[in-house]
Amino acid sequence: MLGGSLGSRLLRGVGGTRGQFRARGVREGGAAMAAGESMAQRMVWVDLEMTGLDIEKDQIIEMACLITDSDLNILAEGPNLIIKQPDELLDSMSDWCKEHHGKSGLTKAVKESTMTLQQAEYEFLSFVRQQTPPGLCPLAGNSVHADKKFLDKYMPQFMKHLHYRIIDVSTVKELCRRWYPEEYEFAPKKAASHRALDDISESIKELQFYRNNIFKKKTDEKKRKIIENGENEKTVS
């Protein structure tokens, strides 16, 4: 066992006293905790292109994923995957899907792809596991409830990694249209490319607009009035 003075000298020789080591450990532990909390606030943005909206017969043909922090800054871009589907399914798509997926080049890309649904889920799951902790980060997107139905059915392992709640930009859009019609007129309009990665990027920009123009930071004056109103209500009650 080292003597007290010798032990202290050795500790100082490798970088500090016992107290300094404890302080450094606290700082590093706090930084790790903050990083973990930050990762838990991330959003998993997903957009799918399908052969239609019938969950019983239609299939996913394209998918893309972006990860943002809670302030909507893009942190990572995931795989943008084209999934092989049989020609019979593509030929049975609605006229709308045939027109738009044909114009965008997606139909041709699907026919040329060799990616299976199982491979796509594996790549997506590998990506989100690197970027987010399990069970904490929500699925986000525009009308993302429709995407979620297909993900629940065809990519259950991917969905198990996410939180059960969703962040649907279309909900904010509809509330803004009703409550703040003047601001709504300036909301970014979708380019309607009907390609997965483009649609996600547009959804993030749209939510950024609502955040900056609808979810406004309270000024000190507003905070004061809210506090006063709260105190008045307590007095009356």
Swiss-Prot record:
<feature type="binding site">
    <location>
        <position position="199"/>
    </location>
    <ligand>
        <name>Mg(2+) 1</name>
    </ligand>
</feature>
<comment type="subunit">
    <text>Homodimer. Homotetramer.</text>
</comment>
<protein>
    <recommendedName>
        <fullName>Oligoribonuclease, mitochondrial</fullName>
        <ecNumber>3.1.15.-</ecNumber>
    </recommendedName>
</protein>
<dbReference type="GO" id="GO:0005634">
    <property type="term" value="C:nucleus"/>
</dbReference>
<feature type="binding site">
    <location>
        <position position="47"/>
    </location>
    <ligand>
        <name>Mg(2+) 1</name>
    </ligand>
</feature>
<keyword id="KW-0460">Magnesium</keyword>
<comment type="function">
    <text>3'-to-5'exoribonuclease that preferentially degrades DNA and RNA oligonucleotides composed of only two nucleotides. Binds and degrades longer oligonucleotides with a lower affinity. Plays dual roles in mitochondria, scavenging nanoRNAs (small RNA oligonucleotides of &lt;5 nucleotides) that are produced by the degradosome and clearing short RNAs that are generated by RNA processing. Essential for correct initiation of mitochondrial transcription, degrading mitochondrial RNA dinucleotides to prevent RNA-primed transcription at non-canonical sites in the mitochondrial genome.</text>
</comment>
<keyword id="KW-0269">Exonuclease</keyword>
<feature type="site" description="Important for dinucleotide binding">
    <location>
        <position position="53"/>
    </location>
</feature>
<feature type="binding site">
    <location>
        <position position="47"/>
    </location>
    <ligand>
        <name>Mg(2+) 2</name>
    </ligand>
</feature>
<dbReference type="GO" id="GO:0005925">
    <property type="term" value="C:focal adhesion"/>
</dbReference>
<dbReference type="GO" id="GO:0005758">
    <property type="term" value="C:mitochondrial intermembrane space"/>
</dbReference>
<keyword id="KW-0464">Manganese</keyword>
<dbReference type="InterPro" id="IPR013520">
    <property type="entry name" value="Exonuclease_RNaseT/DNA_pol3"/>
</dbReference>
<feature type="domain" description="Exonuclease">
    <location>
        <begin position="43"/>
        <end position="207"/>
    </location>
</feature>
<dbReference type="GO" id="GO:0008408">
    <property type="term" value="F:3'-5' exonuclease activity"/>
</dbReference>
<keyword id="KW-0007">Acetylation</keyword>
<keyword id="KW-0479">Metal-binding</keyword>
<feature type="binding site">
    <location>
        <position position="147"/>
    </location>
    <ligand>
        <name>Mg(2+) 2</name>
    </ligand>
</feature>
<feature type="modified residue" description="Phosphotyrosine">
    <location>
        <position position="122"/>
    </location>
</feature>
<dbReference type="GO" id="GO:0003676">
    <property type="term" value="F:nucleic acid binding"/>
</dbReference>
<dbReference type="GO" id="GO:0008296">
    <property type="term" value="F:3'-5'-DNA exonuclease activity"/>
</dbReference>
<keyword id="KW-0496">Mitochondrion</keyword>
<dbReference type="GO" id="GO:0005730">
    <property type="term" value="C:nucleolus"/>
</dbReference>
<keyword id="KW-0539">Nucleus</keyword>
<dbReference type="Pfam" id="PF00929">
    <property type="entry name" value="RNase_T"/>
</dbReference>
<feature type="transit peptide" description="Mitochondrion">
    <location>
        <begin position="1"/>
        <end position="25"/>
    </location>
</feature>
<feature type="active site">
    <location>
        <position position="194"/>
    </location>
</feature>
<feature type="modified residue" description="Phosphoserine">
    <location>
        <position position="92"/>
    </location>
</feature>
<dbReference type="GO" id="GO:0005739">
    <property type="term" value="C:mitochondrion"/>
</dbReference>
<dbReference type="GO" id="GO:0000287">
    <property type="term" value="F:magnesium ion binding"/>
</dbReference>
<dbReference type="InterPro" id="IPR036397">
    <property type="entry name" value="RNaseH_sf"/>
</dbReference>
<dbReference type="InterPro" id="IPR022894">
    <property type="entry name" value="Oligoribonuclease"/>
</dbReference>
<keyword id="KW-0540">Nuclease</keyword>
<keyword id="KW-0809">Transit peptide</keyword>
<feature type="modified residue" description="N6-acetyllysine">
    <location>
        <position position="173"/>
    </location>
</feature>
<dbReference type="GO" id="GO:0000175">
    <property type="term" value="F:3'-5'-RNA exonuclease activity"/>
</dbReference>
<dbReference type="GO" id="GO:0005759">
    <property type="term" value="C:mitochondrial matrix"/>
</dbReference>
<feature type="site" description="Important for dinucleotide binding">
    <location>
        <position position="164"/>
    </location>
</feature>
<keyword id="KW-0378">Hydrolase</keyword>
<feature type="binding site">
    <location>
        <position position="49"/>
    </location>
    <ligand>
        <name>Mg(2+) 1</name>
    </ligand>
</feature>
<dbReference type="InterPro" id="IPR012337">
    <property type="entry name" value="RNaseH-like_sf"/>
</dbReference>
